Structures are given as structure tokens and as C-alpha cells.
């Protein structure tokens, strides 16, 4: 059963996250407070919805299936219980989706570009991450991060984001794991073949970081997460670079790859 990684756990003054289909980083360790400066939280009155990535001071990229009404974006967060002095909150001014996205497939062209209502200032805990300049090769070690589940079968979410290293896998691995549905060419297959490390509930929309660039967006994967030979499927950001750059430049009629 495939899970789309988005969340809905309560915020209760502490914010609780979303799942791969909103999932959490399973098998990871608490991130260093300075290693997730580009990581963004999408949240509303119910709690954390998804992750996202700051790509410049005015724009965030996340998963299209993370779209929700009345959400805000939070920058510079580490602990749900202890505020960083440089945390910043913004509203979405505009949201952009691929115009050729299939309405009946929640994870088709699973990318959403968000223009902020005002610029975010770089600070100790806030900085953008570069878009990819070239694709990651099979075997590359990449970083995942988020406030998703740390135990796949239990509603347990961490106070600080967890991080883990996983590998880029051949697309054939994901196609074999999920033979009952299409694994698009515009995605990346990533995980650990033996299982044990994966994005999970509440991690949707967050980054797959390879060589210091946002190469992927958490989209979907196996359920429960972290199972052997059931890696995660990530939107391949490189394939959407032209669309992203066109939208940022003001060409709102730009289309995405088929």
C-alpha cells in the first residue's frame, strides 16, 4: 500500500508533523541545528502539514499534494519546544502547479512552487538551497530530513527534525517494488535496499539533498515506511528546473515536462 507523505497531527503549542505521503524520517538521528537552514514547515491550525525547501528569499518548493487551505510557512525552526530567535513566518502569496498535471493522480508532477508574501531574511538558521545543476548518479549518498514518524507503525514524532543518509537507486528497484502503479521518469528512486531508513508520515514535500543541492522532493513510498526493497519515490527537481525558473521570471504560462 502506498502512502503519500502529508500530516495531520495536533499542534498543541508544539507542532507535530506530516506524513511521506506525509512521512517522517525513520531510522535517522536528530539533525544538527545548523544543517537544515533551508528546511521549511507548512502548517495550519491543526498542526504541521508538510516540509518544503527555501530556494531563494521569495520562493519555496514543496510537493503538490501538500496543498491545503489557510496554511502558513515557518522558517528557521529546530525544536518544537524551544524557539529560535530568528524564526520567521510567511503567508503564501501565490501557488503554482504544473498546468498539465493529472487531476486524478495526486502524485503526478508532484511539485508546488510557492511565492511568499514577503522576502525571508537569511540568518543563522535560515538560508536557501540551490536548485540542481546536474542529476545525481546511482549510488550517490543523499540526505533526507524532517519531523516525520520515527517509528513507522506508531504515531511518534520527534521534537527536532531527524536526518539520515540514503542512496540513489536504479529506477528499476522502484518499478519492481510498485509494479501496480506507474513510477514516472521524472522521479528519483532513493532509499536503503535492506530497509531501515526512509522518509515517513509528515515528511512530504521536504528535500532530498545530494551534493548540496535539492535534487528531490518527498512524494510517496511504501507503507509502512522503511521496508526492505520498498524505497521512497521523490519528484526529480532537475526535470522541473526550466519550469521553476520560468515561473520565478514571471512566465506563469510555462508548462512542465510530460
From Swiss-Prot:
Propeptide: 19-24
GO cellular component terms, A-Z: extracellular region; secretory granule
Residue positions with a glycan: 44, 122, 185
Disulphides: 31-163, 50-66, 98-256, 142-210, 174-189, 200-225
GO biological-process terms attached to the record: proteolysis
Primary location group: secreted
Record-listed E.C. numbers: 3.4.21.-
GO molecular function terms noted in the UniProt entry: serine-type endopeptidase activity; toxin activity
Activity regulation, short description: Inhibited by PMSF at 2 mM concentration but not by EDTA.
Tissue: Expressed by the venom gland.
Domain Peptidase S1: 25-249
A Pfam family hit: Trypsin
Cell location: Secreted
Keywords: Disulfide bond, Fibrinolytic toxin, Glycoprotein, Hemostasis impairing toxin, Hydrolase, Protease, Secreted, Serine protease, Signal, Toxin, Zymogen
Matching Gene3D superfamilies: Trypsin-like serine proteases
Enzyme active site: 65, 110, 204
Enzyme class, spelled out: hydrolase
Family stated for the protein in its record: Belongs to the peptidase S1 family. Snake venom subfamily.
Subunit text: Monomer.
Miscellaneous remark of the record: Negative results: does not activate nor degrade plasminogen or prothrombin (F2). Does not activate factor XIII.
Function: Snake venom serine protease that may act in the hemostasis system of the prey. Has weak fibrinogen clotting activity.
The name this protein goes by in its record: Snake venom serine protease 2
Organism: Protobothrops jerdonii (Jerdon's pitviper)
Amino acid at each position: 500500500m502506498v502512502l503519500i507523505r502529508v500530516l495531520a497531527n495536533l499542534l498543541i503549542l508544539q507542532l507535530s508533523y506530516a506524513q511521506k505521503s506525509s512521512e517522517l524520517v525513520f531510522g535517522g538521528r536528530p539533525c544538527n541545528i545548523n544543517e537544515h537552514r533551508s528546511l521549511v514547515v507548512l502548517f495550519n491550525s491543526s498542526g504541521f502539514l508538510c516540509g518544503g525547501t527555501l530556494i531563494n528569499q521569495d520562493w519555496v518548493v514543496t510537493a503538490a499534494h501538500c496543498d491545503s487551505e489557510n496554511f502558513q510557512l515557518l522558517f528557521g525552526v529546530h525544536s518544537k519546544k524551544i524557539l529560535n530567535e530568528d524564526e520567521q513566518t510567511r503567508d503564501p502569496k501565490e501557488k503554482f502547479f504544473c498546468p498539465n498535471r493529472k487531476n486524478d493522480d495526486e502524485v503526478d508532477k508532484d511539485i508546488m512552487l510557492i511565492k511568499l508574501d514577503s522576502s525571508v531574511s537569511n540568518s543563522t538558521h535560515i538560508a536557501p538551497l540551490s536548485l540542481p545543476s546536474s542529476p545525481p548518479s546511482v549510488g550517490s549518498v543523499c540526505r533526507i530530513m524532517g519531523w516525520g514518524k520515527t517509528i513507522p507503525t506508531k504515531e511518534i514524532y520527534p521534537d527536532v527534525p531527524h536526518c539520515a543518509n540514503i542512496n540513489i537507486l536504479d529506477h528499476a528497484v522502484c518499478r519492481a517494488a510498485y509494479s501496480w502503479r506507474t513510477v514516472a521518469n521524472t522521479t528519483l528512486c532513493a532509499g536503503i535496499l535492506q530497509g531501515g531508513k526512509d522518509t515517513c508520515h509528515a515528511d512530504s514535500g521536504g528535500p532530498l539533498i545530494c551534493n548540496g543541492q535539492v535534487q528531490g522532493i518527498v512524494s510517496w513510498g511504501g507503507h509502512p515506511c522503511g521496508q526492505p526493497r520498498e524505497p521512497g519515490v521523490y519528484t526529480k527537481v532537475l526535470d522541473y528546473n526550466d519550469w521553476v525558473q520560468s515561473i520565478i521570471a514571471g512566465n506563469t504560462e510555462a508548462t512542465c515536462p510530460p
